[in-house]
Amino acid sequence: MDSLSIVILAAGKGKRMYSSLPKVLHPIGGEPMLARVIRTARALNPSRLVVVYGHGGEQVRARIQDADIVWAEQAEQLGTGHALKMALPHLPQDGKTLVLYGDVPLTKASTLQRLEQAAAGGMAVLTDVLADASGYGRMVRGADGKLQAIVEHKDCTPEQLAIREINTGMMALPNARLADWLSALNNGNAQGEYYLTDVLELAVKDGVAVESASVDASWEAAGVNNKVQLAELERILQANQARALLEAGVTLADPARIDIRGELKHGMDVSIDIGCVFEGAVELGDQVEIGAHCVLKNVKIASGTRIAPFSHLEDAVVGAECRIGPYARLRPGAELAGHVHIGNFVEVKKSKIGEGSKVNHLSYVGDAEIGRKVNVGAGSVTCNYDGVNKFKTIIGDNVFVGSGTLMVAPVKLERDSTIGAGSVISKDTPAGELTVARARQVTVPGWKRPQKKSG
């Protein structure tokens, strides 16, 4: 089999995005458009992957740091043919080259494989048929149905404007012919650019077989030139991902109200309520329930756990049969064993919480290690930061922490101890004992509140 090279054209400025961010770095599905195109390209196992960059090149290369990518600069944006010419020195003289676009993010790998296969005897172009082909290059065929040329919209005759089959821009080309064809391009057109599409006519003149492959859906070939189009493709992507979840057995309260900005793995009988956002790598075990308006980023949740509405979890691990929220926040480094309860307005960061422990109300747990079957009362805080350094709180098994307790780290509460409500614990507490650290209650007879002066 011929070796396959892939060239991704990503040099455009994107004026209509009205942004200092290069167009190909605008996100879709939680990652830059260019990153998504690269990921799709890799599914074809190319021997070489070249990205042609131009506008905002430093930003693009800083964001996409894959070591195996070959970078080719197009200092002046003189058209797609000129862009591919910039990649030519990096391509082998044999095999095929697949040309993709950094602002066309939703093309499926299976479609590109069909395009590659169609070019087995020469070159191939990926096409689509649109009800309204305005703005697109038209596929001009002869009486025998064979492709003869691609004519850009601005250069079309009235008869050609009636053609509905359009060029998506993606094509597969024989490397042995590339240098000659690209050198033969001229910019004698309405745009004054070197069109890659003119290669098709050169191929026909040279007697090279030109075939076509079609997309399965028009959104596969849809490009992004402005924020409206980006938003439209984002919704299409999210709808596709939601449908895939439904087909795999996940229950979605409303498929139109879920956003997946990364990879979501799941077990059986998972249910997700409305308005949830999944970012990065998220893994949900069997029978996990996610309540409305939760945000999960890089988390792993074991089977049977329920996340109540409006909870935020990031870089956290949650054990089986836990109850989280509502309005709970698990920050990076939170590790919960099984059957843990984290209630409303509780924040946990860089802490391990043991089997069956509960932190149910209005509390902060940071830089802590909590044992099994611990109860942390409402309004309790691990005071872990002195303004410069952070310190650890250790709570042993079966400790009961009364409401409103401040634990000033570094401090250790030994197993089976009880802490009286309202205590400020700054020293280690002994096992199995009651510790109370608060001022004695005092009543001042006859005390009066200060009064505001009248007038």
From Swiss-Prot:
GO terms for molecular function: glucosamine-1-phosphate N-acetyltransferase activity; magnesium ion binding; UDP-N-acetylglucosamine diphosphorylase activity. UDP-N-acetyl-alpha-D-glucosamine binds at residues 9-12, 23, 74, 79-80, 101-103, 137, 152, 167, 225, 331, 349, 364, 375. Transmembrane segments: none annotated. One of its GO terms (biological process) is lipid A biosynthetic process. It is found in: Cytoplasm. It catalyses: alpha-D-glucosamine 1-phosphate + acetyl-CoA = N-acetyl-alpha-D-glucosamine 1-phosphate + CoA + H(+); N-acetyl-alpha-D-glucosamine 1-phosphate + UTP + H(+) = UDP-N-acetyl-alpha-D-glucosamine + diphosphate. Residues 228-248 are annotated as: Linker. Pathway: Nucleotide-sugar biosynthesis; UDP-N-acetyl-alpha-D-glucosamine biosynthesis; N-acetyl-alpha-D-glucosamine 1-phosphate from alpha-D-glucosamine 6-phosphate (route II): step 2/2; Nucleotide-sugar biosynthesis; UDP-N-acetyl-alpha-D-glucosamine biosynthesis; UDP-N-acetyl-alpha-D-glucosamine from N-acetyl-alpha-D-glucosamine 1-phosphate: step 1/1; Bacterial outer membrane biogenesis; LPS lipid A biosynthesis. Acetyl-CoA binds at residues 378, 384-385, 403, 421, 438. The active site is at 361 (proton acceptor). Residues 249-455 are annotated as: N-acetyltransferase. One of its GO terms (cellular component) is membrane. InterPro entries: Bifunctional_GlmU, GlmU-like, GlmU_C_LbH, Hexapep, MobA-like_NTP_Trfase, Nucleotide-diphossugar_trans, Trimer_LpxA-like_sf. Binds 1 Mg(2+) ion per subunit. Mg(2+) binds at residues 103, 225. Its cofactor is Mg(2+). Residues 1-227 are annotated as: Pyrophosphorylase. Its EC number is 2.7.7.23, 2.3.1.157. It comes from the Bacteria. Keywords: Acyltransferase, Cell shape, Cell wall biogenesis/degradation, Cytoplasm, Magnesium, Metal-binding, Multifunctional enzyme, Nucleotidyltransferase, Peptidoglycan synthesis, Repeat, Transferase. In the N-terminal section; belongs to the N-acetylglucosamine-1-phosphate uridyltransferase family. In the C-terminal section; belongs to the transferase hexapeptide repeat family. Catalyzes the last two sequential reactions in the de novo biosynthetic pathway for UDP-N-acetylglucosamine (UDP-GlcNAc). The C-terminal domain catalyzes the transfer of acetyl group from acetyl coenzyme A to glucosamine-1-phosphate (GlcN-1-P) to produce N-acetylglucosamine-1-phosphate (GlcNAc-1-P), which is converted into UDP-GlcNAc by the transfer of uridine 5-monophosphate (from uridine 5-triphosphate), a reaction catalyzed by the N-terminal domain. Homotrimer. This is Bifunctional protein GlmU. It comes from Chromobacterium violaceum (strain ATCC 12472 / DSM 30191 / JCM 1249 / CCUG 213 / NBRC 12614 / NCIMB 9131 / NCTC 9757 / MK). The gene is glmU.
